[in-house]
């Protein structure tokens, strides 16, 4: 799965009413590059509901918008947004439709855009609600404070969450491992394929090769 940074050319502004889905872009929108901490620029004050937990700064509700061009071939591929961290409750809209949401400010999450894209210009709008205080025991930051990536692949692919490897047994120079490779098929029919697995050491030397049909 191809992965590229998706941090450039975002617009940002504060949302006064997080429950009013207004699709215009206000004049005061700022052009930013992610990662972006929307809380750090707030003026600290003694009466903050968070107190010293977040540096006497209040959280607010934020909006991020980015447009990008989808070519015709992109409509027949998986296009997934990977958010490494967004604080706090996050709602992701693609061309005005809710494509995904996430309610934990510290964990990575994915939003599949395939069913919402169209040829030409597309709009991604991320609404981050961080106005419900207090919600942290330390400085959390606010908004899209970590990297965002665009993942793209064929409709038959290894899951965006990736493979897992676990050491089952380890003794001297012998090890037995268990590898899990989740495969997703978004095609309209079943597909037969070969899965090839290579295990390498820290220097890139191939230690094990396994290939089998599915």
Located regions from the model:
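Beta-strand-rich binding/interaction modules
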Residues: 94, 174-214
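Surface-exposed, low-complexity/disordered Ser/Thr/Gly/Pro/Asn-rich loops and linkers
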Residues: 47-55
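A generic "cationic amphipathic patch" detector
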Residues: 22-23, 33, 42, 81, ...
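Accessory beta-strand-rich segments of carbohydrate-active enzymes
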Residues: 4-17, 54, 58-161, 166, ...
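Accessory carbohydrate-binding/adhesion or oligomerization-edge regions at the termini
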Residues: 1-47, 123-127
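Short, solvent-exposed loop/linker segments at the N-terminal edge
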Residues: 167-175
